[in-house]
Amino acid sequence: MSKVKIIIVTQTYPPRTGGMQSVMQGLAKKLSEFYKVIVLPDHLVPKKEKSKNSALEIKTFPLPKFLRNFYKKIYIKKVIRKDTLLICDSWKSVFAIPINIKNKIIVLAHGQEYLDPRKIDKINLALSRASILISNSSFTKNLAKNVLNGSKLKHIVIPPTYFMDKSPARFKKTKNIIPNLLTLTRIDIRKGITQTMEALSILKKQKKIKEFTWHIAGSGPELDNLKKLSHLLDLKKEIKFNGWVNDFEKNKLFKKSDIFVMPSYKYKSSIEGFGIVYVEAAKYGIP
């Protein structure tokens, strides 16, 4: 095996869906254009999801939670070199790195992992080993700063847009007679989909809005509730639930959409630290 330059220690990775998964995959692919990269996710990654690039290797750890970090430590000790850089998807993954490792550790910050006050001591313990903390936004940086107990850790902001395709050929949009709305996200409470449905239902009853189509793409715990709500609000004709979509289907939805809808808000200990999908929509010129 060629000399390992970067090890990415992560809890999650595609085919699991979400912004963090996309960010970790994009980071791994981009870095593997220049360095040998090994990705260590917690779960199985099917062969079709693995890169054909020989510089990018994925080693999975589909084990009970209490064993994952133990076996990741053993593996890291086996492959690490003096100049290997370690990148963690969050402070939680620092605990999967052997304690005697002196290599540089970069930790990514996404937002909601800094909301639980019960974890402040654990967060500070993990980040005491980090060289750099990279937040996805100034908002996330301030969240992390509030729990860092005056730490002098180098802390910077880099928006996670580095993996996005720049091809202008994908930006050609179709023209619609009927307005086409799009929501593309993990379907949970804080995405504001329920409130949007209720608002559209009121506008429809008051005849302040005519025909429209709303595609809701994604999966998650609120999907069944939203399907029931669309019937209760008499929106079953207008709303199309697409379920999980692959990149090809996602691009098709973006191309034919006029408005992107996702009024996300803080719910309990869950927030939108950055919201990469807003940038994807903007890339297609969708307000």
Residue ranges and their predicted role:
Residues 255-270, 286:
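Acidic donor-binding loop of glycosyltransferase active sites
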Residues 16, 93-95, 105-121, 131-132:
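A short, histidine- and acid-enriched strand-loop-helix "catalytic/donor-clamping" loop
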Residues 87-93:
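Short His-centered aromatic/hydrophobic patch
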Residues 10-17, 22-67, 145, 154:
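N-terminal strand-loop element at the rim of the active site
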Residues 215, 224-248:
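Nucleotide-activated donor-binding/catalytic signature segment of Leloir-type glycosyltransferases, i.e.
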Residues 128-168, 241:
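Donor nucleotide-sugar binding/catalytic pocket of nucleotide-sugar-dependent glycosyltransferases
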Residues 7-9, 134, 173-191, 197-202, ...:
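Conserved donor-binding/catalytic core segment of Leloir-type glycosyltransferases
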Residues 127, 244-245, 252-257:
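Short alpha-helical donor nucleotide-sugar binding micro-motif in glycosyltransferases
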